[in-house]
Amino acid sequence: MPPPPLISLDVEGVYFKTRIATLKSIEGTYFTKLFETNWREQLDRDGRLFIDRDSSVFPVILNFLRDHEKCSLPKDEYQLMRILREAVFFKIGPLRNMIEHKLRTFCTCPPELPSTPIPNQILTQKENVPIVPRNLLLSKPPPPPPPPLPSLMQPKDTVQIPMRKPPTGRNSKKIKTSADSISLPRNFTHIAHVGWNGASVLFDKKMTDDPTVRKICDAAAEAVDLSAVYNVVNKNADEESHSVEVLITGGLMQSRDGTSRH
């Protein structure tokens, strides 16, 4: 009797050799569909079938296809989530059910992927759903909490740029605006805070090479009243990111490159 046919797999650069019957041991999986096609045409010149998946988790996939429910699983939640992701990709339903059941029973985190029902599982008790009074349903929701206060700027995280001294005179307005007093807009990420602390411009060191921050600092340095405070913010990474410039007192400022800044 000839030996069962073997196949060599190249999973992310790691080589595995197993029986084709092992890969086809569970119906409806990725491998059963694969071997229904001309899979030999996908072999490389060394006779290996390349699979672009996680090679560190693939041994668990092979063990389950060989031993089925007798396969032991790790207890670490992170490893279980990685195996669950591979089980979903390879469409191994019994392995997916085992992992989701283990996550719900023993681990603290809920499964990341939508759960599927486990066979032969019967719900024996109804959940106790609290009854909410009608007056609470019709009442207005409580107001949202106030926005958090801006974090204090540490001296080591700021760079000071000397600026002109404000004009002194009887009619001159002495307005001192602190950079820390400008609150951040909601649902935005704070990239840089540019403002005047009474003697110099303050802004984040990380943004010193940013062209937008440089223009803002140049414009603030050319201001006559020296009361401009700017925030540079973004939202949703690069999708909705933009700079927001806030001028406390009106007036027109010119940056050093001649661009008008309002």
From Swiss-Prot:
It comes from the Eukaryota. Residues 5-107 form the BTB domain. It holds the Pfam family BTB_2. Residues 182-195 form the CRIB domain. One of its GO terms (biological process) is protein homooligomerization. This is Uncharacterized protein T23G5.3. It comes from Caenorhabditis elegans. The lineage of its organism: Eukaryota, Metazoa, Ecdysozoa, Nematoda, Chromadorea.
